Amino acid sequence: MSATSLPGSQQPDLGEIRHDWSVAEIRAIHDLPLMDLVFRAAQVHRRHNDPADIQRASLLSIKTGGCPEDCAYCPQSAHHKGAGVARERLMPVETVLAEAAAAKAAGAQRFCMGAAWRQPKDGPEFDAVLAMVRGVRGLGMEACVTLGMLTPSQAGRLAEAGLTSYNHNLDTGPDFYEDIISTRTYDERLQTLANVREAGIGVCCGGIVGMGEGVTDRAAMLQVLANHAPHPESVPINALVAVPGTPLEDQPAVDPFDLVRMCATARIVMPRSRVRLSAGRKSLTREAQVLCFLAGANSIFYGERLLTTANNGQDDDAALLADLGIRVGEPVRAAAE
């Protein structure tokens, strides 16, 4: 018997804010019949969020390529020279702020900046990133950066600059992680998240579907996120973009229903987080995207590029959201609870 067909007294409260999920519980939710899962996720979403509010975030690679990490999915890794991504220096502050202003004019509320570093070094480049953050905030936009690992001091300086959120994805569950990355441990990722939280910055943290992981690995990743208190401010759900020249270049395309299931499950276990339908969305039909929105996804990356891969066109996204009667999202909460 599915969860939606249980008598009322036996219905689990899937909209409760919890931090004690087991992998088995999350796996059971994920594996519900798809229509039951989407129905329950939509109920939770409407209980905690405005379903007509979908945030648009713009993403810019401010320093591209040459990363010393060996993440198997990433064309920016110096280990994957066959991916053909040229190494570029950190962009000038003025160039980044011009891109942010253009993104705002196109309808984005959040501007995300990514640098291909293992960890930023204190000095002129980190100072430039701080200036970028201050400039983006001065435009009236939310600012998010992903720079690799952070020390507590660096997190504190980013907080002082006004950073809204820091992205540091877990990528997958702890048991599958070492199949994908050997140069940074899971615990190091968790420590960076702790440093970000301690500084009072919102946490943006999610993962990637389609790297060869099992469903239990996906549930385990969501468990780690959902058992953090508070929940992440935003949770990016990515479908692998299999880039030629990377170790995962031959991975099969992700089934769109797998993304729907991940969005729905993330919504149920983290009711108030922004669930961001992220990389790989370009491969989805309009109808598949709508299913993800119905299941609780309430943020997208807006703009024709995501770091080094293609994204949906702005005009196509604007037309889809208009057809759905969805307005541009308001600024997100500083924390998910």
UniProtKB/Swiss-Prot annotation:
Domain of life: Bacteria
Cofactor note: Binds 1 [4Fe-4S] cluster. The cluster is coordinated with 3 cysteines and an exchangeable S-adenosyl-L-methionine.
Gene3D superfamilies per the UniProt record, alphabetical: Aldolase class I (3.20.20.70)
InterPro entries per UniProt: Aldolase_TIM, BATS_dom, Biotin_synth/BioAB, Biotin_synthase, Elp3/MiaA/NifB-like_rSAM, rSAM
Enzyme class: transferase
Matching Pfam families: BATS (PF06968), Radical_SAM (PF04055)
The reaction(s) this protein catalyses: (4R,5S)-dethiobiotin + (sulfur carrier)-SH + 2 reduced [2Fe-2S]-[ferredoxin] + 2 S-adenosyl-L-methionine = (sulfur carrier)-H + biotin + 2 5'-deoxyadenosine + 2 L-methionine + 2 oxidized [2Fe-2S]-[ferredoxin]
Subunit annotation: Homodimer.
Family: Belongs to the radical SAM superfamily. Biotin synthase family.
Record protein name field: Biotin synthase
Lineage: Bacteria, Pseudomonadati, Pseudomonadota, Alphaproteobacteria, Hyphomicrobiales
